């Protein structure tokens, strides 16, 4: 507190050994991957929810391989929309406050929810926190053990560990996809297409350009190596909702850091705060 007197003799001193122990990442038990696969096999409507931890652990390619192996839908967190391409047959949108209606219907209809590298904050699960995936058995994988203990999202199977390790372990296991899941995948595809952010009638409106139409047209012109940085407010939210990501594209909001690269970068913002230079 500002102006308070501090007695330094009562402060806890830094202990590098304690710091090292807290930073150690536990190994995921060998029986966990099979337990997850058993849950997937028995579920009627399994759904993977992928967050920023997938990118931070250099696991994007592993995630795509796993989805292809399991043949089940994958949704993405609001700030991880560039993990999975829009035209991927298993893409299930982004069920969040910044997401789309179809994807929200999907997460509410799944009976197994596997979250990978997402801390499931309020911006994701929204304010009716107990209703997010309310019909689902929840498996949560996070490198931060404290995230598994939050009262806002309570997993039935919390897994403290590196999502990269878990994905590698899952890929090594034998698994035959459940043929019944094909109907669920097609239903998810239908929901994504039925409830787009940019409705057909927006293209025929007379008057100022609809921002969703702009986003739609912009992504139609972008290629697989383009990088898009976004400002706050509508520039961020409406783009997250309407983005039709091609695999390899990057999309940032200015709550993170967008480093320069040798590829073309685009910036979309409004009158508010601008992204980092």
Identify the function of each model-found stretch.
Residues 1-42, 193-199:
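Conformationally flexible catalytic loops at phosphate/diphosphate-handling active centers
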Residues 49-52, 105-118, 253, 268-277:
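A short, small-residue-rich loop immediately preceding and capping a beta-strand
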Residues 32-46, 66, 107-109, 217-224, ...:
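Glycine-rich phosphate/diphosphate-binding loops that line cofactor/substrate pockets in enzymes
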Residues 3-6, 52-54, 79-81, 118-121, ...:
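Short glycine-rich anion-binding loops that position phosphate/pyrophosphate groups of nucleotides
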Residues 1, 24, 80-190:
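Glycine-rich, acidic loop regions that bind phosphate or pyrophosphate groups
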Residues 189-262, 270-272:
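Active-site diphosphate/adenylate-binding microenvironment
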Residues 71-72, 133-137, 249:
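A short helix->loop->beta-strand "cap" motif at the edges of active sites that frequently abuts
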